[in-house]
């Protein structure tokens, strides 16, 4: 099965009405300025993929190799460069612009992003554990609980406090509500991972 993919920037969430009058929550993703920087083939690279660049970057913030790589595609250096595998290579050439119209309303996609970081958090917030009783005589409120018995070490996999969020997350089978080519925007039903203005990768669903 061939895959279609595009890079975008999460703008935020809003609501739209369907033709039936149903109110649908959607995430707005800006997907303009996607350019094919490189086409990777089985002969040269050992696998097939296209390399997309997204979000123009000022030249003062880049280096010579990045400028030269972008110049081969007749474009400016890009802030984000990602690969999309399992595509139909015959449909792409270096320098082509990939737009929102590769998807249409009703398509299902997988969206990958970086979840919001929450810093160091305790077991209750991080792992969804129950707290202890809050009564006057209790001395156990929000602690992580027993470390186990007998052996003098903590078992692997024990749910403990630590850094929360900031992970690569993929949400599968999200529906495209609208593909606005004129404004370079995709409206995706529901929420997608990450904070506003963060990078998301949108690909055809695999399931």
UniProtKB/Swiss-Prot annotation:
InterPro entries: Ribosomal_uL3, Ribosomal_uL3_bac/org-type, Ribosomal_uL3_CS, Transl_B-barrel_sf
MF (Gene Ontology): rRNA binding; structural constituent of ribosome
Gene Ontology terms: cellular component: cytosolic large ribosomal subunit
Keyword Ribosomal protein: yes
Superkingdom of this protein's organism: Bacteria
Pfam families per the UniProt record, alphabetical: Ribosomal_L3
Subunit structure as annotated in this protein's UniProt entry: Part of the 50S ribosomal subunit. Forms a cluster with proteins L14 and L19.
Record function comment: One of the primary rRNA binding proteins, it binds directly near the 3'-end of the 23S rRNA, where it nucleates assembly of the 50S subunit.
Protein name according to UniProt: Large ribosomal subunit protein uL3
Annotated source species: Ligilactobacillus salivarius (strain UCC118) (Lactobacillus salivarius)
Lineage: Bacteria, Bacillati, Bacillota, Bacilli, Lactobacillales
């Amino acid at each position: 099965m061939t895959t279609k993919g595009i890079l975008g920037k999460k703008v935020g969430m809003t609501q739209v009405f369907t033709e039936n009058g149903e109110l649908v929550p959607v995430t707005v993703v800006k997907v303009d300025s996607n350019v094919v920087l490189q086409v990777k083939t089985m002969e040269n690279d050992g696998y097939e993929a296209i390399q997309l660049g997204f979000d123009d970057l000022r030249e003062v913030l880049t280096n010579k190799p990045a400028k030269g790589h972008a110049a081969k595609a007749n474009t400016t250096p890009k802030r984000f460069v990602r690969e999309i595998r399992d595509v139909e290579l015959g449909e792409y050439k270096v320098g082509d612009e990939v737009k929102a119209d590769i998807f249409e309303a009703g398509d299902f996609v997988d969206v990958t992003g970086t979840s919001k970081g929450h810093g160091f958090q305790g077991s209750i917030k991080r792992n969804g554990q129950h707290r202890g009783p809050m009564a006057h005589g209790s001395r156990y409120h929000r602690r992580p609980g027993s470390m186990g018995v007998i052996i003098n070490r903590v078992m692997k996999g024990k749910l403990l406090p630590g850094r929360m969020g900031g992970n690569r997350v993929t949400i599968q089978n999200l529906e495209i509500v609208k593909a606005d080519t004129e404004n370079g925007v995709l409206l995706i039903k529901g929420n997608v991972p990450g904070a506003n203005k963060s990078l998301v990768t949108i690909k055809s669903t695999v399931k």
